Amino acid sequence: MGSEKDSESPRSTSLHAAAPDPKCRSGGRRRRLTFHSVFSASARGRRARTKPQAEPPPPAAPPPPPPPAPAPVEAQAPPVEALPSEPAAEAEAEAVAAGPEEDEAAEGGGAEEVECPLCLVRLPPERAPRLLSCPHRSCRDCLRHYLRLEISESRVPISCPECSERLNPHDIRLLLADPPLMHKYEEFMLRRYLASDPDCRWCPAPDCGYAVIAYGCASCPKLTCEREGCQTEFCYHCKQIWHPNQTCDMARQQRAQTLRVRTKHTSGLSYGQESGPADDIKPCPRCSAYIIKMNDGSCNHMTCAVCGCEFCWLCMKEISDLHYLSPSGCTFWGKKPWSRKKKILWQLGTLIGAPVGISLIAGIAIPAMVIGIPVYVGRKIHSRYEGRKTSKHKRNLAITGGVTLSVIASPVIAAVSVGIGVPIMLAYVYGVVPISLCRGGGCGVSTANGKGVKIEFDEDDGPITVADAWRALKNPSIGESSIEGLTSVLSTSGSPTDGLSVMQGPYSETASFAALSGGTLSGGILSSGKGKYSRLEVQADVQKEIFPKDTASLGAISDSASTRAMAGSIISSYNPQDRECNNMEIQVDIEAKPSHYQLVSGSSTEDSLHVHAQVAEKEEEGNGAGGGSGGSEDDPPYKHQSCEQKDCLASKAWDISLAQPESIRSDLESSDTQSDDVPDITSDECGSPRSHAAACPSTPQVHGAPSPSAHKNLAAPAEGQTVLKSEEYEVE
């Protein structure tokens, strides 16, 4: 019953009918769509378009006929759907797995050769080793040559040729494969590390490379090298051989004097700008490594290759970025720093012109900021909205708002800038500039013996003038900086007759002043040289016509021109019976008083000396005839009648008055002069040579005539040399 109903129902007939439906295009097979099948089909389509078309596969065999008893649709649907999807999934997995391999192979094929950045040659990767510090690669030969060059030039630590990363020492060792060069690299690295230690001191012995790290040894500066066989003692402060009982400055001067090289112009061992060859050598101020630089006015900002110290080549001091903007006198380019005169003029100019300049800058900056800031803001906003697709109304609104805000804020910004900038500039001009100049010794301001402030200008570049000679005579100085001839030396002595001579100094850079006088300082000679510094010498010979002479040289040791020296006994030279020389200590006070000088040419000096000699002989004959027959032939020609010779020369102090040229009085009025409160020590008993205007009529008159023996010892002046001839000297 049930089976018949089932067979007669319309549903069962439609499912099991053998005749196909003419409206259905497929043969009755249905397929279920899923997300996996949709995306896998699209992926297969893309791969098919990108990959070259392969040969079509051979036609598959026709499917077997269906079984006679059809299975239900629900039971047969899953196998039908799995048949086409499984090969697609496997093909997709194979394509995904093969994709990265193909990409890596393509990339590997393009990176087979590496281009060296040094020689620009494409090489295989095995010839371009990888570095541990950075990813850059270069060929092995170029790296080896680069390392050799850097080590030989002591440029350690070594950086990558393409970047600033430092190379690993392990890479350097593998690339070099040279033990001696690697040892040199390690030594340079050690020296560079030790140079950064402020307490490290290297042994100054020439054959020793030992260093001593001395912590807290400033109070006990004596160090000893601990290397076996060296044991050199040296100083902690100056890093030189130990100098007992001497300061570092004194030892430095002594070393400079012993190492001084006498060239044609007698240029000493110094760091002067005018001395030395074109290739100048100076030590680093930190590690004392010698550095050579062409003296061609190139850049003066130097960097030590050993310790990395940045210093100025002109002043040899460690510097900062603002060193060449400070009033130190050092320039970024050039062969020498500013002179003292230029520093002082620059300082005075800044001190006087700073208020005017700062006011002018502030007056220009305030309107420029008030007007310029809104204009700048408006242009920036307009350029920002220019490339965008925005409405014109919105753009104009943004520009108007920005300009309005900038107009309100610009006066505030200008006021703050001027309020902060002006005090900073004033503090720099009136604080930093004078302090830096005076700290470096370049201000030239000093106190003049309690008489006020004196400004000293440096006149090193100009010729030596009479005023310079007179200043050197009045204010001799001996300092620790006299290595190159900075000392002005004043030496005086006496002789029986007054005379004037020309003597060329032993050094070409020295202006030598010489004079022969009878018991007084009678004259000076100005012989200018080519050098930068001058030395003042006044020499005299004390002698009898037939007896040997004794010379006294007195060195200036104080600013009051008071000289002390050990001289031979003047008494013995005047006493014919007592010819033994006895040493005595004398003190001569030199006081400047006005008289007259005149300039004569060097070619006429010898003639003028002969004329003065003839005049002196005539005066001597006239005085001898009028003075009586009380004297003998052996008595001194200028012996006073009322005293003995020994008492006259040995027991009395002589006051020597040196004349002052009238041509330089105006120049000396503005400079420091000698104190006028020094009492004159006169002799009422001893006779002294006086002029025609002297009070004592019995004293012989002398006008600078030398004795024949003294005239023979004088050096003849060179042609064209200007000589000072003294017309009148007054001795009290």
From Swiss-Prot:
Disulfide bonds: none annotated. Residues 100-109, 674-683 have a biased composition (Acidic residues). It comes from Mus musculus (Mouse). The chain crosses the membrane at residues 351-371, 412-432. CDD domains: BRcat-RBR_RNF19B (cd20363), Rcat_RBR_RNF19 (cd20355), RING-HC_RBR_RNF19B (cd16776). It is an enzyme of class 2 (transferase). This is E3 ubiquitin-protein ligase RNF19B. The active site is at C299. Zn(2+) 5 binds at C312, C315, H323, C330. Residues 112-334 are annotated as: TRIAD supradomain. GO terms for molecular function: ubiquitin binding; ubiquitin protein ligase activity; zinc ion binding. It comes from the Eukaryota.
